[in-house]
Amino acid sequence: MLPTVFIVSDGTGITAETFAHSILSQFDQKFRLVRLPFVDSLEKAYATVEKINDAAVHDGRRAIVFTTLVDSESNDIVKRSNALVLDMFQRFVEPLEQELELKSSHAMGRGHQNADTEEYKTRIEAINFSLAHDDGQSNRNLSEADVILVGVSRSGKTPTSLYLAMQYGVKAANYPLIPEDFERGKLPSALTPHRDKLFGLSIDPQRLSEIRNERRPGSKYAAPENCRYEINEAEAMMRREGIKWLSSTHKSIEEIATTILQEIRLDRQSY
């Protein structure tokens, strides 16, 4: 039976869940995740304890609980449950208060209550920009891009662009490299004025073939030999044009995005 893990928060639970995933991924074990957001009253805290205790009885073992409850009374209630309770605020915020000699705001959901901030507006603008400039569908205002991802079709450009926009407020356009570009041996004309903003994504040809077969099975587009040709040509073009690039084959979107941010030296971070 899988161990049960509860994500308990007085807000959306995004912070607690992200932290939990980071910790749990260190173990070669599957878990059953139960999300309990908006636990923002004592009544809900008591109901949370009941659910945790029921899971412990059902599983025959203590549950694991990750919490970001800032209300101390609610937190104390949850800590009385039959579980290993990992309290992010107690473990991290309180030591920081002592070190900084400064009291934290203890504002519920503060990290995500940014709907009226400039940071939020920046991210929304970046998302709209990335959607408008996905897969080369528009060349307008490309000069406003922070980065322009290039690579063959299905190499990971779109999800990476959107992640950069949503997480970091980066205006990320993406543009496909197609067989016609390889025949000419040149970058698409729309990209040449923005060479300093280009970053390339490549991928293992066999993996590319598998991905394309899910979309268009049995087609030339997905054939292994065609994928090898496109990847070889794309990488040769990027080397020739002096474009920095990486292989997305064994990297998560988070890893790809972090590498891109380091390479383009764009120190933009969302909190």
From Swiss-Prot:
The UniProt keywords, alphabetically, are: Kinase, Nucleotide-binding, Serine/threonine-protein kinase, Transferase
Residues binding ADP? G151, V152, S153, R154, S155, G156, K157, T158
Q: What is its EC number?
A: 2.7.11.33, 2.7.4.28
GO MF terms here are: ADP binding; ATP binding; phosphotransferase activity, phosphate group as acceptor; protein serine/threonine kinase activity
Tell me which InterPro entries the record gives: Kinase-pyrophosphorylase (IPR005177), PSRP (IPR026530)
Enzyme class, first EC level, given as a word: transferase
Instruction: Name the chemical reaction catalysed here.
Output: [pyruvate, water dikinase] + ADP = [pyruvate, water dikinase]-phosphate + AMP + H(+); [pyruvate, water dikinase]-phosphate + phosphate + H(+) = [pyruvate, water dikinase] + diphosphate
For this chain, the annotated S-S bridges are none
- Keyword set includes Transferase: yes
Write out the transmembrane intervals. none
Function in brief: Bifunctional serine/threonine kinase and phosphorylase involved in the regulation of the phosphoenolpyruvate synthase (PEPS) by catalyzing its phosphorylation/dephosphorylation.
| Family to which this protein belongs | Belongs to the pyruvate, phosphate/water dikinase regulatory protein family. PSRP subfamily.
Cross-referenced NCBIfam families: PRK05339.1
- Official protein name in the record: Putative phosphoenolpyruvate synthase regulatory protein
Q: Which organism is it from?
A: Burkholderia ambifaria (strain MC40-6)
